[in-house]
Amino acid sequence: MNPLIQSLTEGQLRTDIPAFRPGDTVRVHAKVVEGTRERIQIFEGVVIARKGAGISENYTVRKISNGVGVERTFPIHTPRVDKIEVVRYGKVRRAKLYYLRALQGKAARIKEIRR
């Protein structure tokens, strides 16, 4: 990578991100701006994918809300995310869990592991 670009992005990288992988259940505290007010909105779900590297890395979180699947993609190093909490660690054998979109109910559960 170009040294100039690398030096610019190093200052933007966050160091308070916990280690999490696809299959883990996370609670994302996202900052939402409504008019002039800013509030924290919590989005809790299963990480189904992580993509990219460095400053452009992002992850997708999926949850079921009122019987409807909702997915949100967050950049890892964005200032719009206040904090990320890992609720539980899941045991999966894939890097991308897109197959969970087709499953529902107990079939969509992920086995928990102790870390």
Swiss-Prot record:
The keyword Ribosomal protein applies. One of its GO terms (biological process) is translation. It comes from the Bacteria. The keyword Ribosomal protein applies. InterPro entries: Ribosomal_bL19 (IPR001857), Ribosomal_bL19_CS (IPR018257), Ribosomal_bL19_sf (IPR038657), Translation_prot_SH3-like_sf (IPR008991). GO terms for cellular component: cytosolic large ribosomal subunit. Keywords: Ribonucleoprotein, Ribosomal protein. GO terms for molecular function: structural constituent of ribosome. PANTHER family: LARGE RIBOSOMAL SUBUNIT PROTEIN BL19M, RIBOSOMAL PROTEIN L19. This protein is located at the 30S-50S ribosomal subunit interface and may play a role in the structure and function of the aminoacyl-tRNA binding site. Belongs to the bacterial ribosomal protein bL19 family. This is Large ribosomal subunit protein bL19. It comes from Streptococcus gordonii (strain Challis / ATCC 35105 / BCRC 15272 / CH1 / DL1 / V288). The lineage of its organism: Bacteria, Bacillati, Bacillota, Bacilli, Lactobacillales.
